[in-house]
Design a protein with these regions (language model features):
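C-terminal motif of bacterial Sec signal peptides marking the signal peptidase cleavage site
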Residues: 20-23
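Early extracytoplasmic/lumenal segment of secretory-pathway proteins
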Residues: 26-93
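Extracytoplasmic ligand-binding site segments that recognize negatively charged/polar headgroups
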Residues: 36-43, 80-219
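A ligand-binding cleft/hinge motif common to bilobed small-molecule-binding domains
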Residues: 90-94, 219-242
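Periplasmic-binding protein-like
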Residues: 130, 163-167, 195-201, 207-208, 239-263, 277-299
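A bilobed periplasmic-binding-protein/Venus flytrap-type ligand-binding module shared by bacterial periplasmic
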Residues: 135-140, 255-270, 286-289
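Extracellular/periplasmic bilobal clamshell ligand-binding domains
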Residues: 299-333
Length: 333
């Protein structure tokens, strides 16, 4: 009986050891990706990466722009992040050598992209360009006996009081691109005077803290005119809203977001493979589904009701952190 128990115990221990060994051998390599993208875009990227790389445990995690920028600036090359899928160029530029030079890596070809979107440092690759627009609920304006505005100066007329929504540049990249474009076209002093006048016509408690504030205000009928992102307005139109998309003479302000690898991790072959797939498949699919504005020289995408000829504005200084810090320092709201 003792012999039988001994044999059973030995077999049990052997099975446990084999199970433990198998578990260890099946442990997947973790690759961590951070992005400031909307949740549905992150979900799509996560699904594509999981299907392409079942041998890896790839985590695509959301962080707000400010949170991710601060995290990467504080942690530098020692961060847990391997790949940045999407972050505003201004903040990527500020990271300097904390992000890797990408020349020579698989599938990295800066000649594929519009030259104005390619950084001189070659440390990040364009992911999306997203423009701002004036979204108008014409029916609400008609109800109030008001015409559709045709220029920025119309927005500061007293008859539009309480009908306009714009994000605060201090807390929203959307608000900042409108602000910067106004500075570039009118000069800093005149631009600040303009936004002082516009503040008197804003709905609710003034400039919204979130970039999605204006489109939400339009949906709720709290505003008739929203300074928002083009894709936000198109999304609502495709869901049944009767909005008009306007671009004034100054053109559409815009921002560019890009992808990067943390410095020191660009030599890891697994990270190289994931980053290459991000460029060749995930980025184009994101354009096809959500953000069709052109980033490639010879490749375009279309989405129902999305403007195809967007007149882009003068966005000098958009990637310059010193310019942004200076302008936000004098912004009083």
């Amino acid at each position: 009986m003792k012999k039988i128990l001994s044999v059973l115990l030995a077999v049990s221990m052997l099975v446990s050891a084999l199970f433990l060994l198998a578990s260890c051998s099946e442990k997947k390599k973790v690759i961590t990706i951070y992005a400031t993208s909307e949740d549905f875009r992150i979900k799509n990227a996560q699904q594509m990466l999981n299907e392409k790389f079942p041998a890896y445990k790839i985590k695509v995690e959301y962080r707000s722009t400010g949170e991710l920028a601060a995290k990467l600036a504080n942690e530098g090359k020692k961060t847990d992040c391997d790949i940045v899928m999407e972050l505003e160029n201004t903040y990527l530029e500020k990271l300097g050598d904390s992000i890797a030079v990408l020349d020579g890596l698989p599938e990295v070809n800066f000649d594929n992209y519009l030259p104005e979107l390619v950084p001189a440092s070659h440390r990040y690759v364009p992911f999306i360009r997203t423009s701002g627009t004036i979204a108008v609920n014409k029916a609400l304006l008609t109800e109030k006996g008001l015409p559709v505005p045709t220029c920025y100066d119309d927005l500061i007329k007293p008859e539009y009081k309480g009908l306009i929504s714009m994000p605060n540049p201090k807390s929203s990249g959307t608000g900042y691109v409108f602000y910067l474009n106004m500075v570039n076209t009118r000069g800093e002093e005149k631009a600040l005077e303009y936004f002082d006048a516009l503040a008197k016509n804003l709905s609710g408690s003034g400039y919204t803290s979130s970039g999605s504030g204006p489109i939400k205000a339009l949906k709720l009928g709290e505003a008739a005119i929203g300074l928002c992102m083009t894709w936000q307005a198109v999304d609502e139109i495709n869901n049944g809203a009767s909005y008009e998309i306007l671009y004034f003479a100054e053109g559409a302000p815009y921002n560019t977001y890009s992808s990067a690898i943390i410095s020191g991790k660009e030599t890891d072959e697994d990270i190289q493979k994931v980053f290459a797939y991000l460029l060749t498949d995930v980025t184009p699919k994101d354009k096809e589904l959500y953000a069709p504005e052109q980033i490639y020289k010879d490749r375009t995408f279309t989405i129902k009701n999305f403007p195809t000829d967007i007149p882009y504005a003068d966005m000098r200084g958009n990637d310059d952190t010193a310019v942004k810090e200076k302008l936000l320092d004098v912004w009083k709201y």
